[in-house]
């Protein structure tokens, strides 16, 4: 019997949290995945460390926030093949990945587009 949408979303969430812990060194405090047509949206909350939070708030120029954001995005881009493989192992073929993070809310959004709609 094929997995339900909810089961697949839970598996993706579990795999993404594991990736964050093992590759990035710290997991999110909250995570949720949504499968929407030909997209997978992953929302990770609580991803910024205390040290990064202090750096981000140390000056008003925004330089600390920019450094954190730039390094976090670069790290995720380097890990793109691993993330695509995680999804492939769960039965999805991701054709692109888009990401952004908010230092202010300590939240990352990852959007994967798939080769066809989920059904």
Task: State each model region's role.
Residues 1-119:
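Interaction-mediating elements
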